[in-house]
Structure formats: structure tokens, C-alpha cells
């Protein structure tokens, strides 16, 4: 059973997919979105769901450090609700505190250039969200 992980931001959605056994997460792509124009990349996510035969989607929920829900987390919750209605699959919200920071740290330690980091950080954050989910549920 393949599971998709999403790191939803205001400009991009990082996408990761699990292996067929649900043990490891791999980055797939970063989808460009535009909240101001109401372009959220749902169609591309649906294409990837079909292509990879995904059975469940995990959306990162960026809670505040004190466990409260801020504006970014509210946006992620709405994204998850709309996505679930559009694709007809279960969508799970998963605490993703500090995943983008951890992803950036990993890329800096790997000596990845700033330009390249910007291109891959959301995809890596999606991998971290999905891998955390897989590690906890397997």
C-alpha cells in the first residue's frame, strides 16, 4: 500500500511517496501553487495519486511549538479537507513541527547550494513528514 506525504506551503507543495510496503519515503516533486490565485495543485496531486496507486495521503500539520494551531496550520487543515473530497481517499494530518528546519539543516550539512536547497527543501520536508508517519505506524 503506497502512502503519499505532502508538505503544504503558501507557494509550493512538496510530495513524497512510500515504497509499496510502506517502509520508506522517497521525494517525488515540488508542485508550484499560488494561494492568491486560488491555484493549489490539487489536479497534479490527483495525477500522482493515480500514477503511484496511492491509498492514503498524509498532510503535514505545522503546529506551533506550544501545540497550538496557527494560520499556516489552519491552511493545511483546509487543504487536507478539500483534497480528501477531491480524491476520495483518506487524508491524515500529521504533526510536522520543525521538519522544514530539519530539512534545511540536512541540506546545508550536505553542502547543497542555496539555489538548489530552495528547489528541493519542500520535497525533503515531505519525505521527513511521511517517514515520521511510516515509522510511527509500522
From Swiss-Prot:
Family matches, as InterPro entries: RNaseH-like_sf, YqgF, YqgF/RNaseH-like_dom, YqgF/RNaseH-like_dom_sf
Keyword Cytoplasm found: yes
Keywords, alphabetical: Cytoplasm, Hydrolase, Nuclease, Ribosome biogenesis
UniProt GO BP: rRNA 5'-end processing
Subcellular localization(s) per the UniProt record: Cytoplasm
Superkingdom to which the source organism belongs: Bacteria
GO terms under cellular component: cytoplasm
Enzyme class, UniProt record, top EC level: hydrolase
Pfam families in alphabetical order: RuvX
Disulfide bonds: none
Enzyme Commission (EC) number: 3.1.-.-
Major place of residence: cytoplasm
Family matches, as SUPFAM superfamilies: Ribonuclease H-like
Entry annotated with the keyword Hydrolase: yes
GO terms assigned for molecular function: nuclease activity
Primary role: Could be a nuclease involved in processing of the 5'-end of pre-16S rRNA.
Sequence similarity: Belongs to the YqgF nuclease family.
Protein name: Putative pre-16S rRNA nuclease
